[in-house]
């Protein structure tokens, strides 16, 4: 029934479209500045996948309206700096200082590279006076490692703070196409999603598919047709959308959220 509304096309208000454009512009401007100012420095750009920023932003806005109080997010290095700046509110001054090689005291800084850093913020996404907690777990260059950590953090928050009410905590995982298809840990997390001892009420997985894994063409990286075929293991809903169509990306993310919040069958949504 939901898919039949408006022929499954985005039905966004003018204000929503303007906000999406604002977040997209922030993502593009951020990457453009880094490319101009810090030529040749590693930053693992989100260029080509900037629609991730308005997608996550729209997800948080909508989930806040549905009563979610905490977001626990994990992602690899691709696009992390833009996410820190444009979603989590990390100061761009601090990010640029890391590019400039600013020294930090050992007591307050773990010495890891800038695109591995985590962050925790309290934000008021809908400007209604209600603040929510959003956390991005730190992640090394070991792809998909953070996925299990995010599930553990979410499960602990559910049990300790919300009497296991899965509508209050939302885990979000962002993957690359090569990593979700090639790393065994991703499969293990999916298989544990509905087990009583590990369930978190369902995780929303977002795959940024740039069709390459380091230097490996996707045709040489997996046997399955799609990198997201791992979701079929548990019959989880899987949606494919063109990242160049930002409104369609937002539409897909909001559908994933609605499914997760309505059915609470502890499945993932990809």
Language-model features: locations:
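Active-site capping/gating regions of soluble enzymes
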Residues: 216, 239-265
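Conserved small/polar residues in nucleotide/adenosyl-binding loops
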Residues: 269
């Amino acid at each position: 029934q939901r898919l039949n509304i408006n022929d499954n096309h985005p039905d966004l208000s003018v204000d929503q479209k303007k906000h999406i454009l604002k977040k997209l512009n922030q993502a593009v401007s951020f990457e453009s500045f880094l490319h101009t100012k810090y030529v040749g420095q590693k930053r693992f750009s989100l260029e080509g996948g900037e629609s991730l920023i308005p997608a996550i932003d729209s997800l948080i806005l909508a989930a806040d309206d549905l009563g979610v109080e905490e977001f626990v997010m994990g992602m690899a290095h691709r696009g992390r700096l833009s996410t820190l700046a444009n979603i989590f509110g990390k100061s761009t001054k601090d990010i640029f200082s890391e590019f400039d090689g600013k020294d930090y005291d050992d007591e307050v800084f773990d010495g890891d590279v800038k695109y591995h850093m985590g962050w925790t913020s309290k934000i008021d996404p809908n400007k209604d006076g209600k603040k929510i907690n959003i956390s991005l777990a730190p992640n090394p260059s070991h792809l998909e490692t953070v996925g299990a950590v995010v599930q553990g953090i979410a499960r602990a928050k559910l049990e300790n703070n919300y009497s296991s009410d899965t509508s209050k905590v939302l885990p979000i995982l962002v993957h690359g196409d090569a990593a979700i298809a090639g790393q065994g840990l991703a499969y293990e997390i999916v298989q544990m999603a509905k087990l009583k001892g590990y369930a978190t009420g369902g995780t929303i997985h977002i795959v940024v598919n740039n069709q390459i894994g380091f230097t490996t063409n996707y045709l040489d990286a997996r046997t399955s047709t799609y990198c997201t075929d791992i979701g079929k293991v548990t019959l989880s809903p899987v949606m494919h959308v063109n990242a160049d169509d930002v409104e369609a990306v937002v539409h897909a993310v909001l559908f994933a959220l609605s499914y997760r919040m309505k059915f609470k069958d502890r499945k993932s949504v990809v």
